[in-house]
Amino acid sequence: MSLQQLKRKSLRDGWLMDGVVPSPGAEIDSPLFQTESKIQQLEKELESLQMQQLRLENPAAVQPEAKAIQTPFLNGEKIQQGGGQAGDAKEVTAGQANNTHGIIHEEQPTKEDQDMGTVLPIPAPRGKTVPKEDENQANPELKVDMEHQKVELVDLIQECPVENQTVEHVEKNKPHLDQEHTEKNQDGQHGILEFLTQDQQLGNPNLQHLDRYLITEVTVKHFEKNQAHPGQEKNQDEQHGILKYLTQDQQNENPNLGHLDQYLITEITLQSNPLENISVHDQTQSTSDQNMETKLPTDIPQQKESQSEGKIQTKDQGPEFELLYKDHSHEKGTTDQTQHQELLPSSIEPKEENPKAQDEKLDHHNESVSTVHEQKEVHDMDPRQLSTHQKSLSISEDQNQGSVSLSDPQNQDQSLALPEKGLEETPQLNLSHEVQCEEPSLMEQISISLLQSMEQNQEGADQTPKSVALEELSELLSSDMIKQSVLLSKNLEESPSTASTEETQETMCQAVIIPDLKKENSDPEVVQESSSHEPMSSTIAQSSSAEGNSSPESRPLLQKSQGTDSQQGGNTATQQEERRKKKTCQCCVVM
C-alpha cells in the first residue's frame, strides 16, 4: 500500500509540475524521476525475496508452477545482472542452482548465439522479455497477487483432491451414460423420455432445460412412425384409422400428444374427405369421356369441350326427367321454403351411375336432390355471368321447361319432322358453330341430348315403358301447365322485364325441343334416326325456337334483335306459343 501511495503521489506531482502530456525528455529532467527509479528497484527486491520465501516454505508444492511462472523474472533479472545489481544477481543465481531451470537458461544463449552469429553476453531473443518486465515494474502488486492466488490454489488441491476427482469423473462419464441410454433404446421409441424422467427425478439441473424440446421432438417422431407403418397397414381401407389412434392416446392421457391432437385431426380430415370426392368425380368424368369420344360425330369438334361442363349431371338425366314432370306443379308452390335450404353435396349424384337401378329404387332421393338443385340455382343465377358449375346445375331446369312443349301438338309434330327433312350439312354445321360461339349452354344441351340417346340405345328394351310413361305424364300435365302459365303471365306483365331476363329466357327456351325428340320416339327405328340426326336438328331447333336468332346469329346474345320470326329449319310456331314459353321461363328466373 505504501508503494502504491508513493507511486500515485509521484504521478500526481508530475502531472501538476509538467502537465498531463509531458514531453519525452521531461521525465529525465524532472526531480521526481529519481524517486520513481528508487521505487522500481525496491519493488524488484521485494519480488525476489517473496519468491525465495515461497520456495523455502513449501518447495514440493511451488516447484511445478514456480518453474513456469518465474522464467520471465529470471530472464529479466539476468538482464539487470549486467546492469550492476550485484546483490540481486547473487540471490537469483543461487535460486537457479537449486532449480533445474537454470540449466535450460544456460543452454539457450549458446544455441541462439550460434544461429545469430553473435557472441553477446545478453542475447537478442531475451530482449523481447523487456516489455513484460516493464509491465511488471508498472504493476508489481498485481503480480504478487497472482502468485498468491496460484499458491492458494495449489494448497486447495493438496487439501481436497477427492472432490476434484469426483467432479472430473462425473464430467467424463456423462457422455458415456448418454451413449448407453441411446444405444439401448434406439429401437424403443420412448428411450430418451425414460432417460429424461430419470434425470428429472435425480434433479439433474443441466438437462432440465432440454426436456420440453426433446419430449416434443420424440413425440412428433413417434407419431410420424406410427402414422407411416402400422396406421397404413391396418387402416388402409378405413378412413378413420389415424383418428382412432389419436383417441386412444387421449384415453391413455398421454400429455405429450395433447397439443398435437386438434391440429392433426383437422389436417387428416381435410386431407381424407376431398380426395374421396375427387376420386368419384374422376371416375364419372372418365367414363363419360370414353362414352362421348366413342359415339360423338366427328363433324362437330367443339362439342367435346362443352360436354365436359355438364358431365356430372348428364349421367342421371333419364330418371330425373320423369321426376321433373311429377314435381313441376309442386315446385312452384314450395319455392319460398326450399330457397333457403342448403345444397346437397354434388358427390351424391356421380355415385349413382346405373339409370336402371335409379328408376326402381332411388326415385324419392332424386326428387329431393333435383328440386333443391333447380330452385337454388335459379334463385342464385346471374344472367350475364354464369359459371360453368351453375350451367351444369341449371340443366335440370332447362329440362323442366321441356314439359311446356309437350302440351303443344304442333311443336311435337314439327320436332319429329325435323330429322326427316333433307337438310344440307354445310349450313347446319355453320349454325352449330355460331350457336356454340354465342352461348356455351347450347352445346351443353346438345351433349345432354347425345348422352340421353346413348343411354336409350344401351337400354333397348327399357325404352318403351319410359316413353309411354312420359306420354301419359305429358298428357296429364298439359292442362295444368297451361293454367299456371296464364296465371304467371298476368303477374309478369305487371312487373318490369329487363333485357337480361329476356336474353336468359332465349337460352333457356332453346332446350325445349331436345327432350321431345327422344322421349316421344317410342319406336326403335325412330330412336336411331333421332340419335343420328340429333346434333344438327337440335342446333336448328334451338336457333329457331328463340326469337332473334335469324339474322344476327354471329353477334352475342346481348345484342340480338327481338321480335323477328325465325326462318331457318322450317319451325313455324305461332307467336302465342312462343310468348307462353317466354313467360314460363321468366317465372323460373324470377323465382
UniProtKB/Swiss-Prot annotation:
Cellular compartments annotated: Cytoplasm; Nucleus; Cell membrane
Renumbered ranges of Sequence repeats: 171-174, 183-186, 224-227, 234-237
Impact upon substituting residue 587 to S: Strongly reduces membrane association
Motif annotated as Nuclear localization signal, chain positions: 579-583
A GO molecular function held by the record: ATP binding
Positions of the propeptide segment: 589-591
Family from the record: Belongs to the paralemmin family.
Name of protein: Paralemmin-3
Organism: Xenopus laevis
